[in-house]
Amino acid sequence: MSQSKADYINVIGAGLAGSEAAYQIAKRGIPVKLYEMRGVKATPQHKTTNFAELVCSNSFRGDSLTNAVGLLKEEMRRLDSIIMRNGEAHRVPAGGAMAVDREGYAEAVTAEIESHPLIEVIRKEITEIPDDAITVIASGPLTSDALAEKIHELNGGDGFYFYDAAAPIVDKATIDMNKVYLKSRYDKGEAAYLNCPMTKEEFMAFYEALTTAEEAPLNSFEKEKYFEGCMPIEVMAKRGIKTMLYGPMKPVGLEYPEDYMGPRDGDFKTPYAVVQLRQDNAAGSLYNIVGFQTHLKWGEQKRVFQMIPGLENAEFVRYGVMHRNSYMDSPNLLKQTFQSKSNPNLFFAGQMTGVEGYVESAASGLVAGINAARLFKGEDEVIFPHTTAIGSLPYYVTHAESKHFQPMNVNFGIIKELEGPRIRDKKERYEKIAERSLKDLQTFIDA
């Protein structure tokens, strides 16, 4: 254990991870200096200067406890996550998922942090790793070049990266509502998605246009590599026709409504393919194209995506874009507390550690923030149980094989298996894992 003589903790970056870390530290009575460069220096992807801004989708994904990210969210609620609390307060309809009004949510997080008496917000670019105090670096996948270079030096000079993409957003008022229908897959939750059905002929024409459309050039000579969870739709399409039909355009559970009068293949009750649109803001005036992250040129996006039934005259308020994300060699560099192995006063959090996704990033900030606060107070570190979702993430990123390490979403495969004979029914198995997880977390909290 080591600790600084400074009477505060630095947090660099006010994204989901940094905001969560700063809050967790401050709620434990410790002053925080929170640095955020947006406001003095922009990033290629962020649209505002708000904290915890969502730059890709507005979805925090599944909300059921039989979904690993749903379990992680429930664990975070029980640990008083500022991200979860404000996300809940700004939910928008999304069926069985948790989606938020991205602007209202980010504004609320920003207001709560800026008004906290123990958090000093400093709008400034950090170009060196501070050595004046315990520090949590949560500068995100869009870390500025100068700081990224210093982190890469810690990384042994290796530039670990992948490319990430965002989906387009359309104005609902410009959608032809006669060609789409409201429904959630398998009718789970409220009917929260606008569905754009395609016949086989429409799909094949769309597929041809998508796979031959011109992509925007990358800003780097480096080889393209993508994280599977945010892969551009055109890259996915080039893997084969069926890839999209089993992915974002999967029609299963999205049967035509009885009053549907549009084109269909014969008397089929289910479309050949479906493009889903999800509400993006509380007012319900904006919808994003689910799973359609893209790096096509903007003119090509307009041409190709207006082939989707209902979007023939759609106005795109934001086109899809792609950016480079960096992440660390966490198995070699970090402890399960998200603490540097070489410098105990240094913590990392967020996507740069190899956790992937909004919720996962915030969870890493929660763990790093708690442990930075404990180090400040001279207390022992805490390692969350491997039987919990919030414990399985740091376990995974610090125990994976370094050579093949890639970013990871939370999933039941990284949570410690149940003892005893394997339960064959997947839903029942996940229910048992979730039950054990929440019980173990409560025991851990009470200890």
Curated annotation (Swiss-Prot):
This is Methylenetetrahydrofolate--tRNA-(uracil-5-)-methyltransferase TrmFO. The keyword Protein biosynthesis does not apply. Its EC number is 2.1.1.74. GO terms for cellular component: cytosol. NCBIfam families: gid_trmFO, PRK05335.1. The keyword NADP applies. It comes from the Bacteria. One of its GO terms (biological process) is tRNA methylation. It comes from Streptococcus thermophilus (strain ATCC BAA-250 / LMG 18311). FAD binds at G13, A14, G15, L16, A17, G18. The gene is trmFO. Catalyzes the folate-dependent formation of 5-methyl-uridine at position 54 (M-5-U54) in all tRNAs. It catalyses: uridine(54) in tRNA + (6R)-5,10-methylene-5,6,7,8-tetrahydrofolate + NADH + H(+) = 5-methyluridine(54) in tRNA + (6S)-5,6,7,8-tetrahydrofolate + NAD(+); uridine(54) in tRNA + (6R)-5,10-methylene-5,6,7,8-tetrahydrofolate + NADPH + H(+) = 5-methyluridine(54) in tRNA + (6S)-5,6,7,8-tetrahydrofolate + NADP(+).
